[in-house]
């Protein structure tokens, strides 16, 4: 059976936190729908009215 490598030294809290500094989640940007003025994601169909790019794509 092969032996796996193990850490030689304990990772400090500072090193651990510096490694995790890029792991934060970001809030998606919400835009106003030009048809119903509800909130929607960019480049997505509006969940309130079903419009995308000025035309109705989904019957809501």
From Swiss-Prot:
Keyword terms of this UniProt record: Ribonucleoprotein, Ribosomal protein
Chain segments annotated as coiled-coil in the UniProt record: none
Pfam hit, one: Ribosomal_L32p
Gene Ontology molecular functions: structural constituent of ribosome
InterPro entries: Ribosomal_bL32, Ribosomal_bL32_bact, Ribosomal_zn-bd
Segments of skewed composition (Basic residues): 1-23
GO-annotated biological processes: translation
Name by which UniProt lists this protein: Large ribosomal subunit protein bL32
Designated gene of the protein: rpmF
């Amino acid at each position: 059976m092969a032996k796996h490598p193990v850490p030689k030294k304990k990772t400090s809290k500072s090193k651990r936190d510096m490694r995790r500094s890029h792991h934060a989640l970001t809030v998606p940007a919400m835009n106003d729908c030009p048809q119903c003025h509800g909130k929607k994601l960019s480049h997505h169909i509006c969940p309130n009215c079903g419009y995308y790019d000025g035309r109705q794509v989904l019957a809501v």
